[in-house]
């Protein structure tokens, strides 16, 4: 305990420096919207999002220190606090809310209103922050030195290395601009195809790769291990399952297909089989993966909840000094009560008082679990999808048992699941950000206000983003697979209507169990089973680039800086492609995409088009090397 009391942050508690300023709010809100939109687009495409804390911190340091000539590390910390909330809220929203759009596309309900999406996102985000605030002293202060908080600590280190902020910010902006340009060339002007495919005559499987910079960046950031698991899942689906389905079921019409499998393959190729059958196998694998990860985490979850509640009963350390000031507890309790009443009474959230009670109970439980688990194992290993699956199963069973079935009950279940998923994601992000602030000497109260500002900004933007993407391409398509949302939809329909192709679902479940038995992390493997193999292959390329960096013969310090530069550049590429992806969605809604499409005018033959795609992909890879591997090589001369 003495060691904890003697901890000295970078900025002393008695020193007051700018934090929550007009500059930090404006920059933070902009980054919250940008990274929220970019991660919404990315998550719907590849089934995962990437943390915005470090790129937001680097951008803020670059702008505040280099452009504005100010030296305020706590101001930069507030920027990343506000900005990272956008990514976390987007992650929680896209894993669940697209299910409402999918039901609307099937004619089961009207499309959800912008107000409905906004209300759910805002309530979930605000509850996530408010539930976490009382836990700060227990998790951040009392367990300092016990909980490592990987991302929170790394973000603090980036901010402390502020003198490098300008150069690092330029790396992020370079990735943003370059990826945006390539995205516009590939999907806007359509000068080259977005995929390179290889097919073998007489064999129903196919392999290939997409050439998108953001997808490749996901592989680099996740690393070779996770990338290889996803690629393995894609190989199982596209080179084993699809050929087997076509070979043994060619003359059969199997539900949910409506034509003989042979005819489906002849007219639509492997993609038709993927759309009718593989998605259900992938969803079964994802469900099993989420449940397995939750079961494996149960001892830790129980211990986490128990320890957090015990710690909350302890004496608050630090008195009323600046670095230990939280939002007033009375205000927090009143706000939680008001939000609970809104969940019950607002027509945009179709749940009863029972549903509101479920939200509060599960919300506080999973907020507590998420807040501590990110401290133990990091945000990347926080089983948010497993928490959402557990909540959905229990909520759907309760709603059906109490007579709230049909589409109304399904809407209520997804609303509850969405709020809980967002609560868990935001609580984890808040916990990481408060750890960063604790190390730097930030004022917790100002950070908590910053989190609320970020939640409001991203919550107001996410509904528009979802509407745009649905109008442009639709969810559950090859363009936007939305694997988690498809899974949540499947779970609710399975409980309410019992009309799923259970044989396909259980094939996926047993694939996931087999992966777990041989020691393969189930969730990345399951996402790989669900997603197109071309997307998985592109992710694998990014993972191989990272592997090459890790295996290089450079000195340890140079290797770490090189890998870090690559991470920043790839973070920028994800943001850049996401921004242009949203812009192209706007173009598609207003039919501008047809005007700028040059593919028909060029009329390239398939071999020439493939060569063009290979050249573009090679350029994307070379530019990653330029801003990481070769950048440090030049500096060392």
Regions found by a protein language model. Name each.
Residues 1-637:
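Alpha-helical multipass membrane-protein architecture
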């Amino acid at each position: 305990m003495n060691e904890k009391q003697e901890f000295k942050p970078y900025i002393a508690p008695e020193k007051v420096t700018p934090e929550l300023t007009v500059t930090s709010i404006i920059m933070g809100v902009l980054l919250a919207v940008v990274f929220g939109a970019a991660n919404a687009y990315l998550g719907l495409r590849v089934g995962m999002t990437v943390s915005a804390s470090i790129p937001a911190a680097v951008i803020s340091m670059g702008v505040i220190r280099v452009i504005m000539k100010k030296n305020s590390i706590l101001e930069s910390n507030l920027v990343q606090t506000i900005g990272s909330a956008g990514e976390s809220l987007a992650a929680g929203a896209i894993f669940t809310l697209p299910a409402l759009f999918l039901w609307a596309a099937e004619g089961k309900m009207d499309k959800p209103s912008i107000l409905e999406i906004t209300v759910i996102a805002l309530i979930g985000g605000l509850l996530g922050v408010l539930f976490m605030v009382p836990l700060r002293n227990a998790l951040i202060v009392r367990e300092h030195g016990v909980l490592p908080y990987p991302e929170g600590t790394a973000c603090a280190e980036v901010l402390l290395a502020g003198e490098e902020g300008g150069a690092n910010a330029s790396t992020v902006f370079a990735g943003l601009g370059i990826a945006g340009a390539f995205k516009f060339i590939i999907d806007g002007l359509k000068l080259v195809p977005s995929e390179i495919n290889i097919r073998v005559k007489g064999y129903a499987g196919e392999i290939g790769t997409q050439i998108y910079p953001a997808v490749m960046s996901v592989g680099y950031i996740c690393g070779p291990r996770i990338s290889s698991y996803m690629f393995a899942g894609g190989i199982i689906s596209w080179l084993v399952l699809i050929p087997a389905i076509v070979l043994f079921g060619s003359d059969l019409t199997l539900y949910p297909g409506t034509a003989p499998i042979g005819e489906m393959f002849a007219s639509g190729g492997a993609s038709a089989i993927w759309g009718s059958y593989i998605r259900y196998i992938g969803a079964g694998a994802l469900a099993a993966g989420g449940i397995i990860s939750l079961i494996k985490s149960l001892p830790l979850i129980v211990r986490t909840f128990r320890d957090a509640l015990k710690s909350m009963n302890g004496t608050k350390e630090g008195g009323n000094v600046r670095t230990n000031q939280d939002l007033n507890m009375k205000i927090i309790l009143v706000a939680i009560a008001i939000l609970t009443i809104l969940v019950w009474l607002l027509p945009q959230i179709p749940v009863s008082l029972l549903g509101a009670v479920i939200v509060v109970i599960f919300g506080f439980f999973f907020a507590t679990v998420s807040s501590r688990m990110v401290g133990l194992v990091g945000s990347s290993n926080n089983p948010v999808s497993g928490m959402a699956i557990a909540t959905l199963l229990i909520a759907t069973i309760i709603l059906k048992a109490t007579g709230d079935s049909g589409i109304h009950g399904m809407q209520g279940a997804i609303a509850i699941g969405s709020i809980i998923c967002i609560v868990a994601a935001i609580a984890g992000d808040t916990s990481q950000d408060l750890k960063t602030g604790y190390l730097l000497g930030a004022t917790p109260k100002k950070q908590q206000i910053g989190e609320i500002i970020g939640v409001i900004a991203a919550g107001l933007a996410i509904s528009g983003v979802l509407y745009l993407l649905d109008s442009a391409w639709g969810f559950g398509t090859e363009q936007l697979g939305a694997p988690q949302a498809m899974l949540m939809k499947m779970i609710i329909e399975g409980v309410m209507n019992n009309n799923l192709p259970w044989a396909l679902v259980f094939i996926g479940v047993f694939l996931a169990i087999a992966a777990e038995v041989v020691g393969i992390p189930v969730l990345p493997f399951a996402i790989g089973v669900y997603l197109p193999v071309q997307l998985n292959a592109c992710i694998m390329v990014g993972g191989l680039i990272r592997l090459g960096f890790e295996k290089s013969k450079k000195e340890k310090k140079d290797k770490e800086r090189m890998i870090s530069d690559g991470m920043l550049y790839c973070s920028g590429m994800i943001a850049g492609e996401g921004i242009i992806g949203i812009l192209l969605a706007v173009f598609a809604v207003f039919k501008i995409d047809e005007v700028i499409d040059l593919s028909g005018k060029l009329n390239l033959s398939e071999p020439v088009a493939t060569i063009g795609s290979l050249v573009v992909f090679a350029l994307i890879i070379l530019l990653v090397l330029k801003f990481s591997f070769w950048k440090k090589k030049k500096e060392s001369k």
